Amino acid sequence: MLAVLSNHVYRHLFLAQLIALVGTGLATVALGLLAYDLAGGNAGAVLGTALAIKMAAYIGVAPIVGAFADRLPRRALLVTTDLVRAAVALCLPFVDQVWQIYILIFVLQSASAAFTPTFQATIPEVLPDERDYTRALSLSRLAYDMESLTSPMLAAVLLTVINFHWLFAGTAVGFVCSALLVVSVALPVVRRASDARTGIYEKTTRGIRIYLKTPRLRGLLALTFASAAASSMVIVNTVVIVRDQLERSQSDVAIALAAFGGGSMLAALLLPRLLDQLSDRRVMIFAAAVLAVGLSAMTIVTLTFADAPGYWLALLAGWAVLGIAYSMSVTPTGRLLKRSARSDDRPTLFAAQFALSHACWLVTYPLAGWLGAQSGQAAAFGAMAAIAAAGAIGAAIIWPSADIDALAQPTNAAF
């Protein structure tokens, strides 16, 4: 897998992604502490609002930026958004009002909504070979999982010697380093198929129209709901299950999340070889089915053995299985997007996936949390299992088994 790093351009881009991820992880910890510093017991409401603003920025900004990304130099766009994020990070330590957090978070996440899909659409241009690109996707998944495990630990170590405000400085350094790595390489020039002028509506909706006209991508949307259901259950309710239901320590929350992350990392390591042998469709639909079965099993276990001594081990095993299946269901996404559009359409298509996937999370995050709080964790598990099962079945129906690599070309009346 690491052989793909021999590509000079990709190596720099991967390091830029990795450093920016660590910086983002530090900012996540610091933002929670800043919210508590300003709002005290209402910090949860502040963070919840910040999360909603983040999702709104991702869903609203990504398609707009994606529509114009092919008309802008990609390197300049990536560097500019990195520098904007660095500037916002440097402003956050000076915040003394909650509303200021909301404004800065919107600017920060809008820049991320511009950076991430453009970055993702650039990788297949740098690595046109399918096998190399698959390995790059697995490395990217590993980077995300490693960040989720290491950034909180790094923040904990730093907080023993510095004030949390300095974590924002670390975030800014990460974004600046990312910008320097991007500017140090020449990115492929993507030529537009046509210079014909089109309206704003046509440009901003093109990615979603291509997405919805492509059967494999409609199937991908169903799979995205399945993966969002599983990840929402883990992200939202792990702390409640471990701390409230099991009455275990804060470190056990980290252990449970590490079980999910470890499973995801294991799958990312194995996926390149697996995808050499099996189709994306078979792997991803099977993974979604495993998510549904795993969540269903946890529903039964929670209903019958929630108070048993072995529930903790069952939770760890369940989270590991969900982590494996989650990684298998989301990692090949880039391969589907790559083969579903021309080079000049890829930024807008990646932006469409970015927005639609976060729209799925915008549904499943609050649903998992509300059901867990109001009806109990078994109800939350059951609802997420139903969503995952519907996603797996829907994908199997919508995504043709004889998948043809044809590019969908939407008309103005198609959407």
Residue ranges and their predicted role:
Residues 1-415:
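Alpha-helical transmembrane-bundle signature of multi-pass membrane transport and export proteins
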